[in-house]
Amino acid sequence: MTASTSSTPSTSTKIPSSSKSSVTKQTKQKRNERERKRVDQVNQGFVLLQERVPKAAGNKAKLSKVETLREAARYIQELQKQLGMSSTSFHNSMPADFPTPEQSPVYPQSVCSMMAQTPSPSYTSPYYPPPQMMSSNQHDMSSHYYQESSSSSASTSGDHHSFYSHTETY
C-alpha cells in the first residue's frame, strides 16, 4: 500500500507537529524570560528611585510606582527652586553658588552623614587620565565657549524646552 501525498508543494516541507510545538514552546519561553527580565529591571529601578527620593516626615509606607514618580518630580522641582533655576535658565546658565547637601532641607540627612563618613575613592584608570588644573588661557577659552554656546542656544531655543517647562501639580 502506498502512502498518499498531497499535490501541494508545502506538504513535502511540513514540520512534524511535535517539533513545531517544541519550537513554539521554546519561542514562548524565551519571550517570557525576556519579559520577566525586563520587568525585574524596571522594578529594580523603582526600588533605587524610592531609596533616593525623600519621603514626607509622616509617610513611612512604601510608595507605589506612580507615587514614586510624582515624588521624584516634586523633588527635582524643589531642587531647581533651591538652585534658582527656571525652566529657561536650566540649560542656559548655572548659578555660581550651589547649596551643599547639608544646607538642603529636602536632602536626606542619613545620606549626608553617610557621605561624610565614606572616604572618597582614589580611582585611577589607564584609559581616563586624572583631571588636571586648567591654565588661565584654557579657562579663558572655555568660558568664551560657554558664553557663545549659551547665547546661540538662547537665540535658537524655540520651543524645544517646552517639555521641561511644563509643570504639573500633583
Curated annotation (Swiss-Prot):
InterPro entries reported for this sequence: bHLH_dom, HLH_DNA-bd_sf, MASH1/Ascl1a-like
Keywords, comma-separated and alphabetical: Apoptosis, Differentiation, DNA-binding, Neurogenesis, Nucleus, Serotonin biosynthesis, Transcription, Transcription regulation
Consequence of gene disruption: Egg-laying defective. Reduced expression of the tryptophan hydroxylase tph-1 which leads to reduced production of the neurotransmitter serotonin in the hermaphrodite-specific motor neurons (HSN). Inappropriate lateral projection of HSN axons. Lack of netrin receptor unc-40 expression in a subset of HSN and VC motor neurons. RNAi-mediated knockdown prevents cell death of a subset of the serotonergic neurosecretory motor (NSM) neuron sister cells, and survival of NSM sister cells is increased in an hlh-2 mutant background.
Keyword Transcription found: yes
Sequence ranges assigned to domain bHLH in this UniProt record: 26-79
Keyword Ribonucleoprotein listed: no
Tissue: Expressed in the ADL sensory neurons.
Pfam families to which the protein is assigned, alphabetical: HLH (PF00010)
Residue ranges of the region described as Helix-loop-helix motif: 40-79
Subcellular location(s) per record: Nucleus
Region annotated Basic motif, chain positions: 26-39
UniProt-annotated stretches for the region Disordered: 1-42, 118-170
Source taxon at top rank: Eukaryota
Compositionally biased spans, kind Low complexity: 1-26, 143-157
GO cellular component terms listed in the entry, alphabetical order: nucleus; RNA polymerase II transcription regulator complex
Job of this protein: Probable transcriptional regulator. May mediate transcriptional activation by binding to the E-box motif 5'-CANNTG-3'. Plays a role in the differentiation of the hermaphrodite-specific motor neurons (HSN) that are required for normal egg laying. Might play a role in serotonin production by regulating expression of the tryptophan hydrolase tph-1 which catalyzes serotonin synthesis, in the HSN neurons. Also plays a role in HSN axon guidance towards the vulva and the ventral nerve cord, possibly by promoting the expression of the netrin receptor unc-40.
Quaternary organization: Efficient DNA binding requires dimerization with another bHLH protein. Forms a heterodimer with hlh-2.
Name of the molecule in the record: Helix-loop-helix protein 3
Source organism of the structure: Caenorhabditis elegans
Lineage of producing organism: Eukaryota, Metazoa, Ecdysozoa, Nematoda, Chromadorea
This protein's encoding gene: hlh-3
